[in-house]
Swiss-Prot record:
Biased composition (Basic and acidic residues): 359-388, 397-521, 539-595, 611-628
Protein name: Serine/arginine repetitive matrix protein 5
Gene responsible for this protein: SRRM5
Origin species: Homo sapiens (Human)
Amino acid composition bias (Polar residues), ranges on this chain: 32-59, 92-104, 213-224, 257-272, 657-666, 682-715
Residues spanning the signal sequence: none
Length: 715
C-alpha cells in the first residue's frame, strides 16, 4: 500500500528527475566514484536497473529498494539522497521491490554510495534528480563506477561530502554513515556490507530517522523514498541525513517502523540475509566507527556470505573502491593481497566473467577487500587468486567472488573484478580470458585479458578475474602457488610482471622458442639461456622475481636457482606449491596437468606449443595451476619455464614463445630443475614482480604496458 504510494512518488520523482537528470548525471561521476561498488549492483542487476526502472510498478522491488533508498536518502542529504536515490534508486526504487532482492543490494549499495556522493551537490535538485539520477546513475554507474577503482577513497570522499552536506544532520554519523555506508555501500552494498554497514549507519540513521518522523514516514513507504526524500527535502538536513542513513541503512529498521516495514524488513532481510551480519553490525546502531569496524570486520565476514553470492560483483567494484578499506581485507583476504585477490579472484573470476561489466567492481571488490584490494587487485593479483578465492568478495559481489571459493571460483576469479584482474586476465592471455577480462570489468582486466592469451589462461584469469584478484585467485587456485603469488607476489604486477615480465621477456619467451634458448630466454631474455637463466633468472629475472619475491626470495631465487633455490622457492611458495612443483616435477607434471584446468588440454594441447600455451593458459587458468599446474603441468619441463614463465606467464601467455617456453619447459630435467626455482620464481616472481612491478613498472608499466603487452600479445 505504501509501496504504491512510494512508487507513485518515485514516478513523480522520475518525472522531475527527467529534467534534473542531467544535473543528477553530473553528480554520478562523483557518486560513481563512490558508487563503484554500486556498479557491482549494476552488474548484479545489470538488466535490473532498467527492469527496475521499468519495474517501478513492482511493489516488492519498490519496497525494498525504495526502502534502501529511503534509508539512505535521509542520511545523505536531501539532495544527495534524492540525487543518489534518483540516480540509483528512484527508478529502481519504484521498481525496486522487484529489484529489492537483487537490486536491493545493488541499488542499495549504489544508492548508498551514490547518495553519499550526490548528497554533496544536489540537496534541492535531489528530488527531481532522484529518479532520473538514479536511473542514469544506474546506467552511468557501470562505466563510471567501474572506472573509479578508488571506491573506498571515492566513497570516503563522497562520504565526506555527503557527511558535510549532511553536516547539520549528523555529521558524526552522517559522515561515518556516508563514509561507512558509502564504503559499506560501496563495498558491502554490493556484498552484504552495505546492509551490514549501512545498518550501522542504520542504527544511527535509524535512530535519527526514527526520530525524524518525516524521514521515517517516507521510509515507511517503500516508494516513500521519494516521499521521504521529498519530505526530507523539507525535512532538516538532519532528518535527511539520518533518513539517508535511516532509509539507506534502515530499510529493515526504518521500514520496520514504517508501514513498509515489510519492505524494509524484506530488504533488511535481503540485505540482512546478505548483509544480515553486516546489517547487524551496522544496524546494531554502531556509530560510524562501529560500522567502520563492522564494515571492515564484516567486509571479510559479511563478504563471506553475501559475498559468496555477490562476491564478484561487489568485489570487483569494491575491490578497487575499497582498496584502502579492504587493505586489511586484502591482507586478511589474501594474506594481504593474495587474500583479497584470492577472494576477489575466485568468485570474481567466476563472476568476473559475468560481472566483468564492472571493471571497477572487481577492482572495488578486490580492493574493497583491502586497501590493498587494489593491491589485492594489483598486489594481490597473486594473492587475489588465493584470497580472491578466499575473500575475493568485496562487499557483495566481491565477497561472493572471493569468498565464494568454489567452482564459482573459476567464475569468481573472473568475477574478481580488478584492473589487475584484467592483468591477470591478460596474463590469462586468451580471448576467453580477455573476454572474461573484459567482463572482468577492469582496465587491468583487459590487461589480464591480454595476458589471458589462451582460453584456459583466460579462464583461469577470468577466474583471476580481478587481474590481481584473478591472479590471486588463479594463484590462489593452487593454494600454494596462488598463495605464494598472493603472499609473494605483488599480485598483479608481479604476476603480470612475472608473466609479463616485459614484452621483452615475452619476446624472449618468443625468442626463447628454442627449448633451451626459449626457456632461458623466458628465464633470461637472452639467448645465453643457461647463463641468462642464471643471470636473468638470478640477476635479472631472479632478481626481479626474487626482488619481487623478496630479498630473501631473490636470494633464494639466486641461491635456489639450484634445486635449493627451487626448494626455497617452493618453500617460499608454500608447501603445497613446493609439493605441487615437486610433484609437478615427477608424475606431478601430469598430475599438475590434470590439476591444470585441462590437464590434457593444457598439457596435452600441443604439449610443445599448444600445451605450452595451454599450460601457460592453464597456468593462467589456475594461476596456481598456471604457475604450478601449468608449470607443473609441464612439471619438469614447463615447470621451470612455467615457473620462469609464470613470472613470465604474461609473456608466455602473451607470446607463443611462452608456449614454446612451455614446450621447451617440457624438458623435465632442465626445466624441472629450474621449475621449482623458476616457478617458485613465479610465485616469488610475484613478489619479485611486486618489486619488479615496482622496479619494472617501466618495464611492464603494470597497467599500461602490461595491458599493451598483454593486449598486444593477446591481439
Amino acid at each position: 500500500m505504501s509501496s504504491p504510494k512510494r512508487s507513485s512518488k518515485p514516478s513523480m520523482s522520475l518525472a522531475p528527475s527527467g529534467s534534473s537528470m542531467p544535473t543528477a548525471d553530473p553528480k554520478p561521476p562523483a557518486s560513481l566514484k563512490s558508487t563503484k561498488s554500486a556498479t557491482p549492483n549494476r552488474s548484479l542487476v545489470p538488466t535490473k536497473p532498467a527492469t527496475s526502472r521499468n519495474s517501478v510498478m513492482s511493489p516488492s522491488s519498490s519496497k525494498s529498494t525504495k526502502s534502501t533508498s529511503t534509508k539512505r536518502a535521509p542520511s545523505n542529504r536531501p539532495s544527495s539522497r534524492s540525487r543518489v536515490r534518483s540516480k540509483a534508486r528512484t527508478p529502481s526504487r519504484v521498481s525496486t521491490d522487484t529489484r529489492t532482492s537483487k537490486a536491493s543490494k545493488a541499488s542499495d549499495v549504489r544508492c548508498h554510495q551514490r547518495r553519499g556522493t550526490h548528497s554533496r551537490g544536489r540537496t534541492p535538485g535531489r528530488r527531481g534528480s532522484r529518479s532520473s539520477k538514479r536511473s542514469p546513475s544506474r546506467a552511468s554507474t557501470p562505466g563510471r563506477i567501474r572506472t573509479h577503482g578508488a571506491r573506498p577513497g571515492m566513497a570516503s570522499r563522497v562520504r565526506t561530502p555527503t557527511s558535510q552536506q549532511k553536516g547539520s544532520r549528523g555529521k558524526s554519523y552522517g559522515r561515518p554513515r556516508t563514509s561507512n555506508r558509502e564504503r559499506s555501500d560501496s563495498q558491502p552494498r554490493n556484498l552484504s556490507k552495505k546492509s551490514y554497514r549501512p545498518p550501522g549507519g542504520s542504527g544511527i540513521g535509524r535512530s535519527s530517522e526514527l526520530a525524524v518522523t518525516p524521514s521515517t514516514a517516507k521510509c515507511q513507504t517503500p516508494t516513500g523514498i521519494p516521499s521521504k526524500e521529498k519530505s526530507d527535502n523539507p525535512s532538516p538536513s538532519s532528518s535527511r541525513k539520518v533518513k539517508s542513513y535511516g532509509q539507506m541503512i534502515i530499510p529493515s529498521r526504518e521500514k520496520s517502523y514504517s508501514p513498509t516495514e515489510m519492505s524494509s524488513r524484506v530488504k533488511s532481510y535481503n540485505q540482512a540475509s546478505t548483509r544480515s551480519r553486516p546489517q547487524s553490525h551496522s544496524q546494531s546502531r554502531s556509530p560510524r566507527r562501529s560500522r567502520s569496524g563492522s564494515q571492515k570486520r564484516t567486509h571479510s565476514r559479511v563478504r563471506s556470505h553475501s559475498w559468496k553470492r555477490n562476491h564478484s560483483r561487489a568485489r570487483s567494484r569494491t575491490r578497487k573502491g575499497i582498496l584502502s578499506q579492504m587493505g586489511r581485507h586484502s591482507q586478511s583476504r589474501s594474506h594481504s593481497k593474495g587474500k583479497s585477490q584470492n577472494q576477489s579472484r575466485t568468485p570474481r573470476r567466476g563472476r568476473s566473467h559475468n560481472w566483468s561489466r564492472n571493471p571497477s567492481k572487481e577492482r572495488s571488490h578486490s580492493h574493497s577487500r583491502s586497501s590493498s584490494k587494489e593491491r589485492d587487485h594489483r598486489g594481490s593479483s597473486s594473492p587475489r587468486k588465493e584470497s580472491g578465492r578466499s575473500q575475493s568478495g568485496s562487499p557483495n559481489k566481491q565477497r561472493d567472488h572471493s569468498r565464494s571459493r568454489s567452482p564459482n571460483k573459476a567464475r569468481d576469479r573472473s568475477r574478481s573484478r580488478s584492473p589487475y584482474k584484467a592483468r591477470d586476465r591478460s596474463r590469462s592471455r586468451s580471448p576467453n580470458k580477455a573476454r572474461d577480462c573484459s567482463r572482468s570489468r577492469s582496465p587491468y582486466k583487459a590487461r589480464d585479458r591480454s595476458r589471458s592469451r589462451s582460453p584456459n589462461k583466460a579462464r583461469d584469469h577470468s577466474r583471476s578475474r580481478s587481474p590481481n584478484k584473478a591472479r590471486d585467485r588463479s594463484r590462489s587456485r593452487s593454494p600454494s602457488k596462488e598463495r605464494d603469488h598472493s603472499q609473494l607476489g605483488s599480485p598483479s604486477k608481479e604476476r603480470d610482471h612475472r608473466r609479463s615480465r616485459s614484452p621483452s621477456k615475452e619476446r624472449q619467451c618468443r625468442q626463447s622458442r628454442s627449448s633451451s634458448k626459449e626457456r632461458d630466454h623466458r628465464r633470461s631474455r637472452s639467448p645465453s639461456k643457461e647463463r641468462q637463466r642464471r643471470q636473468s633468472r638470478s640477476p635479472n629475472k631472479e632478481r626481479d622475481r626474487s626482488q619481487s619475491r623478496s630479498p630473501s626470495e631473490e636470494r633464494e631465487h639466486r641461491q635456489s636457482r639450484s634445486p635449493s633455490k627451487e626448494r626455497d622457492r617452493r618453500r617460499w611458495r608454500s608447501p603445497s606449491k613446493e609439493r605441487e612443483r615437486r610433484q609437478s616435477r615427477s608424475s606431478s607434471e601430469e598430475r599438475d596437468h590434470s590439476r591444470s584446468r585441462s590437464p590434457n588440454k593444457q598439457s596435452g594441447y600441443s604439449r610443445p606449443r599448444a600445451s605450452s600455451k595451454e599450460k601457460a593458459h592453464s597456468r593462467s587458468r589456475t594461476p596456481s595451476k598456471e604457475g604450478n599446474h601449468s608449470q607443473s603441468r609441464t612439471s619438469s619441463k614447463e615447470s621451470d619455464p612455467s615457473q620462469s614463465t609464470v613470472p613470465r606467464s604474461p609473456d608466455w601467455k602473451r607470446s607463443p614463445t611462452r608456449t614454446s617456453s612451455l614446450s621447451q619447459n617440457r624438458t623435465p630435467s632442465k626445466t624441472s630443475s629450474h621449475s621449482p626455482s623458476t616457478f617458485p620464481s613465479g610465485g616469488q616472481t610475484l613478489s619479485q614482480d611486486d618489486s619488479q612491478a615496482d622496479a619494472t613498472t617501466s618495464k611492464a608499466t603494470l597497467p599500461g604496458e602490461r595491458s599493451s603487452s598483454s593486449s598486444s600479445k593477446l591481439a
